[in-house]
Amino acid sequence: RRYRPDWLEDRPFTVMDSADINAAVKACKDELRLGKGDRSFPRTQAIVGFLSKARNKEMRLDEVLQREAFHLLPYAEPLMRLGEAYDAYRKEKGLLDYDDLLFELEHLLRTNERAAGNLRRRYTHILVDEYQDTNLVQARIVRLLAGPEGEGLPPGNVMAVGDEAQSIYAFRGANVRNILDFPKLFPGARIIRLEENYRSTRPILDVANNLLEHATESFRKKLFTRREGGAPVRLVTPLSDMSQARLVVRRIEDLLTRHLPHEIAVLFRAGFHSYHLEMALNQAGIAFRKYGGLRYTEAAHVKDVMAYARLLLNPLDMPAFSRVAELHEGIG
């Protein structure tokens, strides 16, 4: 907040969360009367994803649709108008979304040498974790914070931790070239290979090493572990989510003949992926506990309280106002 964007002038501003962003895009969509009576028009959450993806990949929205949602190309023009309306909405209401924070910081570091110098003096060492999942603007911010060679941070004061073989967020705009090109951007960078794996057994690492050998471009490494034994890796390709769930249930039933329930776990990439398995377990009469889900700040009652505080800070925060209004009868 110390280095607020110039276009805000002296107005208060609010940083939006995901629910606010959805509400703002929906308000703009309703204002433009888009999708009325058209069941094929993309839903608000999907639109938010495409708008953010276009910014993070630094592409035009129609280019993103061409590559990733060809069936939505007929809606490219109205969706681009909606994107422009959303941009105007945020500026009018004094709102910044997550993507704004990145691009406004980059703009500050490029155009305000005094602010850039202050930040470099304040943050004398930079450590970026999961560097393989950074996008283009995040990598540029790291470079700008480091400063020009000979004038910015001393060599060795920038450290990136990551694994180019684990770049899984390209769909959000992550660019694996950021970590592959790190030694070129920071000449003299020292590469420290962390090859001992403390989590996995040898059969798992044998498969991983075999896959790594086929990479066309990477930092060569040979993973090893002191954990001997372990079951061999099995690759199973179910025909559907439900057949996968039934397969897992049968495996759990078999394991329960030899193990206690608390010794059995199923790992998921995301909480909602467990939906079919939860149904299958209930049908089989197998009790289970699910760990994970909504974060505390995303719970409805917490967001209600936060809406009051945000509205006091910024009376133009319409997503917060709408949430508060819904809590009181006779408003709206």
Cite the ranges covered by each PLM segment.
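Conserved helicase NTPase motor core
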Residues: M16-I21, L51, H71-D181, L194-S200
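Conserved P-loop NTPase-based nucleic-acid remodeling module centered on helicase motor cores
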Residues: R1-G49, R55, F70, V236
